[in-house]
Regions:
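N-terminal beta-strand motif that seeds the catalytic metal site of vicinal oxygen chelate
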Residues: 1, 45-80, 86, 90, ...
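Conserved short beta-strand elements that form part of the metal-binding/catalytic scaffold
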Residues: 1, 30, 36-45, 92-135, ...
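Active-site-adjacent scaffolding segments
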Residues: 1-69, 111-114
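Vicinal oxygen chelate
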Residues: 1-33, 72-82, 140-172
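Extended intrinsically disordered, low-complexity coil regions enriched in Ser, Thr, Gly, Ala
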Residues: 10-11, 50, 81, 88-101, ...
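Short secondary-structure boundary micro-motifs
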Residues: 12-15, 53-55, 90, 124-125, ...
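Histidine (H) residue identity feature
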Residues: 61-64, 85, 101, 105, ...
């Protein structure tokens, strides 16, 4: 399906990279017109999903989900402390950055797998990101129910981590 998507995205004028193996998975990097970077990743263990019948994309090429998320930080220690001690994630592996500069550290939550991973690239020479076009200003994590949302909001507040509290997912 990555070949299909490379052609589809190029036909629509997006900047598309080459299909490459990143962290053991076939992946395709591309950018939207504002410079926002995205990656399509094949997942052989993906759960069976029902295709959308009205999609212009053939069923065998439809996207099944989101993940993993990749963030860039100037140094690992502060982010790792929050991920492990506040967010209860597990560090599961590292891999060489696809651009050849540094290491990407992989943290996992819940059952794991691409949709439950956060990849942290240590890139000290990058400028600090600004909010606006071409950037992501927040990430949302799924929880099973409302009591879990309230528990996480309380945990973050107790640890003095700024947070939005409960946000209805359909808002987006």
């Amino acid at each position: 399906s990555l070949d299909y998507w490379a052609g589809r995205l190029q036909d629509r004028g997006l900047t598309v990279g080459q299909i490459a193996r990143i962290d053991t998975r076939a992946s395709l990097d591309f950018e939207d017109p504002e410079g926002q970077r995205f990656r399509l990743t094949e997942d052989a263990a993906d759960a069976v999903t029902a295709p959308w019948e009205k999609s212009p994309v053939p069923a065998q090429h439809q996207i099944h989900g989101l993940g993993p998320i990749t963030i860039s930080v100037p140094e690992l220690a502060p982010t790792e402390a929050v991920l492990i001690h506040v967010m209860a994630m597990r560090k599961v592996r590292d891999y060489a950055s696809p651009d050849g500069h540094g290491t990407v550290h992989v943290y996992e939550m819940g059952q794991g797998g691409p949709a439950a991973e956060l990849h942290v690239a240590v890139q000290p020479d990058l400028p600090v990101a600004r909010q606006g076009a071409g950037g992501v200003h927040h990430v949302a994590f799924r929880v099973p129910d409302k009591p879990a949302i309230h528990a996480w909001a309380a945990r973050l507040s107790e640890m003095r981590v700024p947070n939005s509290g409960e946000v209805e997912r359909y808002y987006f």
